[in-house]
Amino acid sequence: MANNITLTGLLKKAAAEFSDRRAILVSGEFHLTHARLQEIVDHAASLLLASGVGHGDVVALTFPNTIEYIVMFLAVIRCRAVAAPLNSAYTAEEFEFYLSDSESKLLITPPKGIEAARAAASKLNITHVTATLPGGDGLIALSPSPNNESSLDAVAELTNDPSDVSLFLHTSGTTSRPKGVPLTQLNLASSVQNIKSVYKLSESDSTVVVLPLFHVHGMIAGLLSSLIAGSAVTLPAAGRFSASTFWSDMIACNATWYTAVPTIHQIILDRHLNKPEPTYPKLRFIRSCSASLAPTIMGRLEESFGAPVLEAYAMTEAAHLMASNPLPEDGGHKPGSVGKPVGQEMAILDLNGSAQLPGFSGEVCIRGPNVTKGYKNNPEANKAAFQFGWFHTGDVGYFDEDGYLHLVGRIKELINRGGEKISPIEVDAVLLSHPDLAQAVAFGVPDDKYGEEINCAVIPREGSEVDEDGVLRFCKKNLAAFKVPKKVFITDSLPKTATGKIQRRIVAEHFLAQISTAKVPKFGA
């Protein structure tokens, strides 16, 4: 793959090649063609330049999934500035941290709501403006308006460079301190091309974005990969995922695929079981990423919606995609595997940096043009992550004889019970094969005898009744004795991140905090 490509260059090429095809649709309201979207983005970029935004400046954005957000995101990177998307649900204290850590110069929000972000920006003396798109298909208006006169010529004179940092995000992994991840035009361009290639995205495709666009999964896999392919993207009218409107949106836009985290797949499945739609669109594939998908859930999805479910493997530091199960015509998928590397080198290394043979586990390591050059202002994290010429993901996995990657778990999440290393993903899969369980997550807890013991939290299916003894009996039939959870928490909800991911650290802290005598484990630094 060429190392001189840029995301903005790919978007311009698509706008020229597929000028009259639909690019963005807002459910039940309006749509923009690829050419019109490019015009609106260039105009918004001219406003940012007139407002003093320049090369390398960090611009924070906090919006629901709206057309204004997409336009402003693309306009920021067109200016050779850095987009720093933030979750609108953050508290004022969280906004303070993220705005400060990213060194944001400007905050852009909708005219109403998100008061916590405004308060944080004010406290940090960061300029705040609002963005609106009157009528949905007009031109962006900023308030207050720029002091200087805007000029499209100034935008045309800009040349985006592959080395330009365009996106700044924070990780939300197993450590408690989020790490800042700068991603360049080359990183983003490489990733979207990888996604387009492995799923054969084209101008004939269409999808509904169900994930928040402040996260790489929704932004890169759902939105940007579609745009560079000339595809169409529908935004739900509510600005976020809604199970009640999901299939009507999919049918209305002639969707051919969608991507989601396992939690959303389960919500979609549960609605199908309890309130099925009269008809479903014919999908080329369903994609799952950002957390492990149990084979039983994959099977139910395929049976219910008649499309192959392709599980993928991704992380922020790789500008999202690292590996994916291929389409049926390219080799097919393996339940329980996250597929083959896509557009980058991948190796399974031991602690000394030596490659492991197929079937032997080690740390998953990658290198390629999609991978970040390093965390911002964090030499300790960079030293740990970049060794032997590879980026170390912190995940344990192995390749099978066919070259498919199987993940065992996060290094810091593997449960060490008296010297036996247990994969919580394996325990999850068994729990989710129970016919009366809708969701489940296993996690490690401190134990005086074994060092660590296994607990789990489960959500029963609607209308089902389960008890702890029944769940434990099921586990004893399907797991080795040392892998059986010691305690089962039965609940109606699990704590999730803003992107719908279930993190074991957070789940463990949540349930152990309910037991006054429990010692809450310490994870990471």
Swiss-Prot record:
This is Probable CoA ligase CCL9. GO terms for biological process: fatty acid metabolic process. The lineage of its organism: Eukaryota, Viridiplantae, Streptophyta, Embryophyta, Tracheophyta. It comes from the Eukaryota. Keywords: ATP-binding, Cytoplasm, Ligase, Nucleotide-binding. Belongs to the ATP-dependent AMP-binding enzyme family. Its main location: cytoplasm. Both substrate-binding domains (SBD1 and SBD2) are involved in the substrate recognition, and are sufficient to confer the substrate specificity. Its EC number is 6.2.1.-. ATP binds at residues 171-179, 311-316, 395, 407-410, 501. It is found in: Cytoplasm, Cytosol. It comes from Humulus lupulus. Gene3D superfamilies: 3.30.300.30, N-terminal domain of ligase-like. Residues 242-311 are annotated as: SBD1. One of its GO terms (cellular component) is cytosol. Residues 312-375 are annotated as: SBD2. Pfam families: AMP-binding, AMP-binding_C.
